[in-house]
């Protein structure tokens, strides 16, 4: 068993989504670190290790697809894309860039 709770990087620019997801995760004992834009997500990822990344696609500064692409250049951390974009092409692109799963809000 791990010495620390699993650490999740939750990346979404909507406060309501952040609150909706982070509360139950924290209640279950996960360490949730939040980022509100793509640049902040990449900075947080460089600062500490994560066990999972939950990533929105439509983000300010750097979009979620680019964040995913950059993370995949040096990490195999599981990435779940959580987005309002429900077109099949969006899912295909996200998975091809290295996301492990794609969930529509």
What are these regions (language model features)?
Residues 1-105:
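N-terminal/domain-start alpha-helical segments
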């Amino acid at each position: 068993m791990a010495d620390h709770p699993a650490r999740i990087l939750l990346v979404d620019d909507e406060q309501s989504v952040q609150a909706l997801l982070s509360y139950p995760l924290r209640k279950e004992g996960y360490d949730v670190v939040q980022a509100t834009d793509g640049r902040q997500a990449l900075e947080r990822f460089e600062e500490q290790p994560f066990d999972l990344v939950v990533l929105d696609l439509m983000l300010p500064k750097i979009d979620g697809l680019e964040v995913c692409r950059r993370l995949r250049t040096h990490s195999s951390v599981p990435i779940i894309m959580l987005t309002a974009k429900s077109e099949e092409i969006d899912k295909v692109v996200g998975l091809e860039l290295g996301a492990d799963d794609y969930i529509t809000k």
